[in-house]
């Protein structure tokens, strides 16, 4: 079969994805069991990043593996409407291109523009997913704002509302002044920041005394309605029930006792601002305190702020501090590091505000979702995430689901303007169900994007309709996602699946880590260290990029990505291509024949044994999502065992004529066929292209739907594996001595061996093979070790020597080895010094410490080897 001289990845990519689609290869076919999976829908706001690429590649490995295992396999793609993010991007675009703000459009006009934008970017996302060779069923593609998904969202909302699990109330919520919307607690990112702690004097009524209060936010004092102390704090027991005067404002404040107060914070006396702090809000509820809002939705002081009205919160802070100083009411200020909440989208500092919002009661929904994980009905990979999930679920709080946006699922609630009745319905309400009035106004807010995403595993399958897909493919088998959305998404899907389907949404959850740069830094625009998957695909090819990500995807560890790794696995693809060329060029006069044990040579039995062991190990790894281990084993088998050993061992036989050539042709084709099948989930393009060229009987027109190789116990030869391993070790020993002595590997040398115990004749039996692999003139027996020879191999029965006098200048080599030993000695000293430094071991990057330990062990081994070699030739 004709095969090009060079591996050209993009030619294969353009050819095979199209052919797979034309052949409906991605659609489920009846099979033995099923495997279903839904893609975590990428946001439509831009390009897929390297973390998305990792996520898609890992899913595709499992999908292709299960498809080849004969299961009815479906992978449902889709995109997320990404409420806040999309609206933010479209608003920026309109401001830049049209010079207009959202408010310059009607809601309908803005939504039409956003839909056009969304459809354009959904297409971009599709092309990027295709570029990764993802075998998703495009005929089942969904979007979180599809009409069908909107029906699902409305049905869930109405159902939860009717059960009293969705309610509306005025509570302290997280407000983002930039995005102009509420955020759920888990959408707020906290970071430790340096700030100030201001100590303010609050005068006591009818006395010359005052009490000092410490605060990080003096601007909120305008909304203070009490001071509080801990009831057990002896310092302030006499103040409980007294009245203080609010500086600048003059409002009277009761001094109350509440166990929430931390006696170690500041002075032990705290200001209570129930409208601007969630903890103060709770204190306010317990003590029936007035709630005075003084900051508006633009983060400016409102009309309740007196002379500070209209000022930005931070400007107001400066002015208030100045005024406190003028009045002699600022005792001191201190540097203070504290946790500050930021919007996860735009990084603006969150403002806690008292607002009327919609919430979901989570405790009742969490009960079953806790139980299925406790009972291991849902398994987490790595397992440690089970504990993280459960700890969060035990402490779950109600979820604020309303967002002050236009883009999203509008809340299905209509307020009657005549009688005030709240109409909640799946269908649009035309008249009030209570009074019949047609004067209705729909709630302006939309639902949190995660609300629709929480329904993804069953809404994508057609729910609330009872579709065939829903019956067949729910629950799904696997969810692959980033650990950072375990609470945003994973937990909520489990809760909603249990609630509305009466069953978990998936069996297994695989959580991958962040992709960082090679130094372990988070990828970011500011550092300029991001890796664009499309750029590296363009440079190296899809298959090498996929294989690189697979190898790096160790469970439970952040992925450190060195761009050089892509080049390493591009070389692997070249190796596969060149090996295939060699095999196909040596298929002249090939005939399929039944392989009999008596016809097989030791190297044949060894490679068949190694192949079957590899099939077994890789299959086990893929069953438990050890993608990296499966990829590494596959790499090692193909490059080291098949190419470097078996193909090398077989070359003379392939150049022969007769039965032995036919045997080796059949063995090599059998092994190559299975190897390409094993390779397919990781490197689909090159494996499909090369498999098509193999002159074998095929069980399928396309490799994508061919059978996964099965473990065959009759092709396991333990004795042959043991003996050939000794041959490999002996040959490697000879190669190592040649390398250390600067003797070219292809230079033929004489080798001697001495029998130590008479029970092993593996050298004599495999003499020709050893001479061929090690480039030897001859390997012959000796009674004594030759002078000035290096020991290449030792075991319990034999010693192998290379007499070096004929091949090297002994004196020159002694000098060279002495210098190398001196260098190694210094390296060992340096590594030991580093590892005995407690500071280095405890504070350095763990990977750096581990690498230093490995370098030390390697250097010590090398030192011992060279020392022995020097001794032998001296």
Curated annotation (Swiss-Prot):
UniProt cross-references to InterPro entries, sorted A to Z: aa-tRNA-synth_I_CS (IPR001412), aa-tRNA-synth_Ia (IPR002300), Anticodon_Ia_Val (IPR033705), M/V/L/I-tRNA-synth_anticd-bd (IPR013155), Rossmann-like_a/b/a_fold (IPR014729), tRNA-bd_arm (IPR010978), tRNAsynth_Ia_anticodon-bd (IPR009080), Val-tRNA_synth_C_sf (IPR037118)
Enzyme class: ligase
Motif ('KMSKS' region): 522-526
Catalyzed chemical reaction(s): tRNA(Val) + L-valine + ATP = L-valyl-tRNA(Val) + AMP + diphosphate
Keyword Chaperone: no
'HIGH' region (motif): residue ranges: 42-52
UniProt note: domains: ValRS has two distinct active sites: one for aminoacylation and one for editing. The misactivated threonine is translocated from the active site to the editing site.
Subunit: Monomer.
Protein name: Valine--tRNA ligase
Species of provenance: Petrotoga mobilis (strain DSM 10674 / SJ95)
């Amino acid at each position: 079969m004709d095969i090009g001289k060079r591996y050209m990845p993009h030619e294969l990519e353009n050819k095979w994805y199209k052919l797979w689609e034309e052949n409906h290869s991605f659609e489920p076919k009846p099979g033995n069991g099923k495997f279903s999976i839904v893609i975590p829908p990428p946001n439509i706001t831009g390009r897929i990043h390297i973390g998305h690429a990792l996520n898609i590649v890992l899913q595709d490995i499992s999908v292709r593996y299960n498809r080849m295992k004969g299961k009815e396999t479906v992978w449902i793609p889709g995109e997320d409407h990404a409420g806040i993010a999309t609206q933010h991007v479209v608003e920026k675009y309109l401001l830049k291109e049209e010079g207009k703000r959202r408010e310059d459009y009607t809601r309908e006009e803005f939504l039409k523009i956003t839909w056009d934008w969304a459809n354009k970017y959904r297409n971009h996302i599709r092309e990027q997913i295709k570029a990764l060779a993802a075998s998703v069923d495009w005929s089942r593609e969904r979007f979180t704002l599809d009409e069908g998904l909107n029906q699902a969202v409305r049905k869930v909302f109405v159902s939860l509302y009717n059960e009293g699990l969705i309610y509306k109330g005025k509570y302290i919520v997280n407000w983002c002044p930039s995005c102009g919307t509420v955020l759920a607690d888990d959408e707020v990112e906290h970071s430790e920041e340096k700030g100030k702690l201001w100590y303010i004097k609050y005068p006591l009524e009818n006395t010359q005394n005052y009490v000092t209060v410490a605060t990080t936010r003096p601007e909120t004092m305008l909304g203070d309605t009490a001071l509080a102390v801990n009831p057990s704090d002896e310092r302030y027991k006499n103040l409980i029930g007294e009245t203080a005067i609010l500086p600048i404002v003059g409002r009277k404040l009761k001094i109350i006792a509440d166990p929430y107060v931390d006696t170690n914070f500041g002075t032990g006396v705290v200001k209570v601002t129930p409208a601007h702090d969630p903890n103060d809000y709770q204190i306010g509820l317990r003590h029936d305190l007035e709630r005075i809002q003084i900051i508006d939705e633009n983060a400016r002081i409102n009309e309740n702020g007196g002379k500070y009205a209209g000022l930005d919160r931070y400007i107001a802070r400066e002015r208030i501090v100045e005024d406190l100083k003028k009045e002699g009411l600022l005792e001191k200020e201190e540097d203070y590091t504290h946790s500050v909440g930021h919007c996860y989208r735009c990084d603006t500092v969150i403002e806690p505000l008292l607002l009327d919002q919609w919430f979901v009661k989570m405790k009742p929904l969490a009960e079953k979702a806790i139980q299925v994980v406790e009972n291991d009905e849902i398994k987490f990979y790595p397992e440690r995430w089970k504990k993280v999930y459960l700890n969060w679920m035990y402490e779950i709080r109600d979820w604020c689901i309303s967002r002050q946006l236009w883009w999203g699922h509008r809340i299905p609630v209509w307020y009657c303007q005549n009688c005030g009745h709240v109409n909640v319905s799946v269908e649009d309400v035309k008249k009030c169900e209570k009074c019949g009035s047609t004067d209705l106004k729909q709630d302006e807010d939309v639902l949190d994007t995660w609300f629709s995403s929480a329904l993804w595993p069953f809404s994508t399958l057609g729910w609330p309709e009872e579709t065939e897909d829903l019956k067949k493919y729910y629950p799904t088998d696997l969810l692959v996602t980033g650990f950072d959305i375990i609470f945003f998404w994973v937990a909520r899907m489990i809760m909603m699946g249990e609630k509305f389907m009466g069953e978990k949404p998936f069996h297994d959850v695989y959580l991958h880590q962040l992709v960082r740069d090679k130094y372990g830094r988070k990828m970011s625009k500011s550092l300029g260290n991001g890796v664009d998957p499309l750029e590296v695909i363009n440079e190296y090819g899809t298959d090498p990029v996929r294989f690189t990500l697979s190898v790096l995807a160790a469970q439970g560890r952040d992925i450190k990505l060195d761009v050089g790794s892509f080049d390493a696995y591009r070389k692997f693809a070249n190796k596969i291509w060149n090996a295939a060329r060699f095999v196909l060029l040596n298929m002249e006069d090939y005939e399929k024949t039944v392989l009999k044990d008596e016809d097989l040579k030791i190297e044949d039995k060894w490679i068949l044994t190694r192949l079957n062991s590899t099939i077994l190990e890789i299959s086990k790894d893929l069953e438990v999502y050890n993608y990296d281990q499966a990829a590494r084993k596959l790499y090692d088998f193909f490059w080291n065992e098949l190419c470097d050993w078996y193909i090398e061992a077989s070359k003379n036989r392939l150049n022969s004529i007769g039965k032995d050539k036919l045997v080796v042709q059949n063995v090599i084709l059998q092994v190559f066929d299975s190897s390409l099948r094993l390779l397919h989930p990781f490197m689909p393009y090159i494996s499909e292209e090369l498999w098509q060229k193999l002159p074998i009987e095929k069980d399928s027109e396309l490799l994508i739907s061919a059978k996964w190789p099965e473990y065959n116990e009759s092709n396991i030869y333990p004795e042959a594996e043991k003996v050939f391993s000794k041959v490999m070790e002996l040959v490697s020993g000879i190669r190592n001595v040649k390398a250390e002595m600067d003797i070219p590997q292809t230079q033929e040398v004489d080798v001697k061996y001495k029998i130590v115990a008479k029970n092993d004749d593996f050298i004599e039996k495999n003499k020709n093979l050893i001479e061929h692999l090690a480039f030897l003139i001859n390997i012959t027996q000796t009674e004594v070790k030759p002078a000035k020879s290096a020991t290449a191999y030792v075991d319990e029965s034999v010693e192998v020597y290379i007499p070096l006098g004929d091949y090297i200048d002994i004196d020159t080599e002694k000098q060279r080895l002495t210098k190398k030993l001196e260098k190694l000695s210094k390296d060992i000293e340096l590594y030991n010094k580093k590892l005995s430094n407690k500071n280095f071991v405890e504070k350095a990057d763990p990977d750096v410490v581990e690498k230093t330990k490995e370098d030390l062990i390697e250097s010590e081994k090398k030192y011992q080897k060279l020392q022995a070699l020097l001794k032998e030739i001296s």
